[in-house]
């Protein structure tokens, strides 16, 4: 959600901080600010709205400061106003930025007010610099080089909640202190300079050597090096790792928006997944899939529970379908935010899968942590079997919770809306379902080979769909830009695609849209239909094709304009649908990888036609790191 950037070194800090904040815009924000230290003074500049407002203010101020922190804020405590924007400063000069929530800020605020501290915002973050200042004030007159670090450490030990911090102070101009407690923060290593950020895209232009902090760690960054401690004050020895990230991933490379670029990157995502997950006939494998998961994860498996949020939840629904149909394992999909407070009864030999693009989704991590805790100390059959599916294997998911990961291979996704990461999650579920089927021998070798061969053709099929759909969806966008409501229908494995299509449209165009199982339309949603409510129906030849066509006819009888996502261009489909968004003809089991593409493009073009911010839609954050 919020984005943090910090710098200390030999270059002008302001430009580096601004560039880093631009790379974190995808996380969502409503205000921004930067604070630098120069000649014993703090220069703090904040602005409501987009970064260009902050940049305009900074252009009026020239400072050669070589240390500073920056922040993009997504409002949780207090309105999105300039006075609530970060950084927050105490008159004694500590300055802090924070991502997360301080749960006990009210009692700390009252305690500090009683000691004479004056607060100027409504945020929870403002207690942090005041608390640090109060602790520094109580230190002895003989200052120590470790005073600032010690003050931040003492302050952090009084904070309750999930947060990441970056703090500077005018009295300690050569120190940048950073903290992680259940919110992401990564340190970057340069030559005589160091960086910190909420996410690696902010610093990849300057360094490939990074070290993600772990929960309960605090680091002091100086021009001479980095010291890392735990909250108990014990120094830790840690080494950075080299980041395998191409800088072109964080630029548009000729596309108007990141979202459009990322939609067009999906064939490459499927190819990368095929290369990584499938053995290509090499080696003596029991399964044609190579996910590098331990055998005991599959042993005597009876049930699977999947926890996820948003688009990842839709991917999980397709995963459920694949696992049950191919591997014959009963699978349940839960909203992580609900599962935390109403978990299923404890069952034996159960695999718990957490799906999170960022690896930092607060509710998903909390659901996995709860599952891990409630199974601890139980007899062997109840032991926690945890698996994560994430696009960020360096995230909290692997480092703190889940010993087993299927790393999706989408690369960095900058657009707030999940497009290529959704496809990457689907590929992970195809691989998992096929691997389970091979291990359990619930599908013949010939069946597995047929599905895998079909998957190998998918990249070309997506490329063909993209080539044909760009113009068609752009034309439809012109006609539907002022539409107020949409209905999306699907059945079987394509019902989750109807949900995903509706979610994409409402997220980016702010048009009310709902997805339904096509068979449920007559049980309520049909009351909404008239000439002003278009209906998008996903009709793929297979077990439910005729049923979807029948449901579509019911909508047409109520004067709704029908848009068909289908490989069938003539016959009954050609007569029923007013508009066709054709996709290649593939096995029904593989069709979600294709049917989602025109729905992504339709949402994109409608939003662009309406003149909206495609890559940063209002009120949304790429990584939801608070509950």
From Swiss-Prot:
GO terms for molecular function: carbohydrate derivative binding; glutamine-fructose-6-phosphate transaminase (isomerizing) activity. InterPro entries: GATase_2_dom (IPR017932), GFAT (IPR005855), GFAT_N (IPR047084), GlmS/AgaS_SIS (IPR035466), GlmS/FrlB_SIS (IPR035490), Ntn_hydrolases_N (IPR029055), SIS_dom (IPR001347), SIS_dom_sf (IPR046348). It is found in: Cytoplasm. GO terms for biological process: carbohydrate metabolic process; fructose 6-phosphate metabolic process; protein N-linked glycosylation; UDP-N-acetylglucosamine metabolic process. GO terms for cellular component: cytosol. It catalyses: D-fructose 6-phosphate + L-glutamine = D-glucosamine 6-phosphate + L-glutamate. Transmembrane segments: none annotated. Its main location: cytoplasm. It holds the Pfam family SIS. Its EC number is 2.6.1.16. Residues 2-224 form the Glutamine amidotransferase type-2 domain. Keywords: Aminotransferase, Cytoplasm, Glutamine amidotransferase, Repeat, Transferase. Residues 293-442, 476-617 form the SIS domain. The active site is at 2 (nucleophile), 622 (for fru-6p isomerization activity). Catalyzes the first step in hexosamine metabolism, converting fructose-6P into glucosamine-6P using glutamine as a nitrogen source. Homodimer. PANTHER family: GLUCOSAMINE--FRUCTOSE-6-PHOSPHATE AMINOTRANSFERASE, ISOMERIZING, GLUTAMINE--FRUCTOSE-6-PHOSPHATE TRANSAMINASE (ISOMERIZING). This is Glutamine--fructose-6-phosphate aminotransferase [isomerizing]. It comes from Nostoc sp. (strain PCC 9229).
